[in-house]
Amino acid sequence: MSNLFNKIINDRQFNFQPLEFGHETGYHVDVKDKEGTRWEFRMFQIDDKWKMEGEKLPSWIHDLESVIGKAIDAHE
């Protein structure tokens, strides 16, 4: 699995840290919004598609789910 990495998406820096969920792998992701609030969530694969898991995430993060998944694929 890859090491830590970051990617600029829509003018925001997303930070990715590899994680293991039992026998599966995924990423812990964090990003700050314009006000400086740090949002944290997990990305994991289901049926070869990256899915987001997190609580009370703003819609602008949810809207980037496929873009974030593509960034992970490009890094791996």
What do the predicted segments below correspond to?
Residues 9-13, 33-34, 70-76:
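Short, surface-exposed, charge-dense and proline/glycine-enriched linear segments
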Residues 21-48:
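A short, structured beta-strand/loop element
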